[in-house]
Every structure is written in C-alpha cells, then in structure tokens.
Amino acid sequence: MPDAGPGALIDLFVGAIKLDRETYRRVAGRPESTRLCIAIVLLSGLAHGAVLTMRWGPAGGPIVGIASAFASLGLSSLLVWLIGVVLLRYPSGFGSIVRPLAIAAAPALFNLVGALTLVRPVVLVVSAWLLAAFLVAVRAALDCGRLVALGVTLATWAVELSMYYYALRD
C-alpha cells in the first residue's frame, strides 16, 4: 500500500470497510500510514457533521462532527491501550493502536445514506458495521485472538457508554 495520494486512501478505505484483517494489521505496523488514517477519521467526521447539519441546521455541524470523531478516536485508543497494554500486558505502542482504530471509522461514511434517505435500518446496519470494524481493529492493534479482542471491545464499549450516560444525565 503506497503512503500517499488518493489511490492509497481509496485502497485503505476499501480494505477498512471490507473488514480486511490484513489492512488493519498493515496500518498498525506502519507509522507512515498515519496521515491516511487521519484522513479516514476526518472524512467520517465530515459525514457525521453533514448528518448533524441536516438535523440542527448549518451552525457548526461539520466542526462538531470532526471534533467528535477525533475525540472518540482519542478516548477509544486510550481505553484500548489501558485495557490491552497496561492491564492485559499485550506489547503494543500507542500509535499501533490509534491507526487501526482510526480506519475502523470508515463505515461511518455510510451514515450519510441513512440521513439522506431517512431509512433507519441503514443507521442500524452502519452501527453494527462500526462495531465489527472496531473488533477487527482491536485484534490487529493488540495482535491478539478473537476472544481477547471481543473482551477488550466490550469493555471499551461499556466504559464509553457509562461515560456518555454520566455526562449527559441531569
């Protein structure tokens, strides 16, 4: 996989949405692919921002979408690192965790289809797809088996949900 250009980004995007384990493993071990991974998060944030703009109007939708995409990536990466590296002792650097989790955001681009067509099942399918991509990314990031990746994914998800719940309750 080349490190720059639209062809490389498209190849990375296609590998990510196909849940190609080799694509996720490759970016985990290649710091030079960081820019492409950031581009995937940026695009997913723009897609989220477009959906927010359709719901709230133009005031800040893209900015909020991009900010939330990068904040989510940061939080998820930190949680996977804490659980996988610190707690379970899997030898992995932080960058090797961030990059696969970044491309796991690729299916979020399809939320635009759900927003444009107002078809709720699309959003549900994309949500399941994102969870599956996250699982593949965790497995590549920690170089672990399916059960460990599932455990780390579920633990990360539980912590994130509880944080969102406590942040939004009043």
Which sequence ranges carry the predicted segments?
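Selected alpha-helical membrane-embedding segments in polytopic membrane proteins
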Residues: 2-95
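Alpha-helix boundary/interfacial micro-motifs
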Residues: 37-38, 107, 162, 170
